[in-house]
């Protein structure tokens, strides 16, 4: 499996109150083969940035959605925080998540990037402006604080 596939499976499972079990076959000396180690290390790098959307979270009332562009989105929550993980390596300057309404006083941030993001409610859809030159990731997490 590639890191992208592991991340997408993990996010999908957690958004549905599940977990992910990976079978990694070590060598006789306990070391892990390079072709298995590399995707695990890349997944770990992604989790360093986006782990708060995974660890100690639970499912939300809506498990999945998509953007107007057709990108898949998965949701998790922790307390007053809602996490929307966009399962795509590319983000446009504006991301519109269909059928997602948030309270008017909410703040939206992108994990791994500094500062709040501009957003507006367009009917039942949430439109979020994405900053330029963001760090490349396999998936991006919007943190919505209500």
Where are these regions (language model features)?
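Mature catalytic domains of secreted/periplasmic carbohydrate-active enzymes
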Residues: 1-146
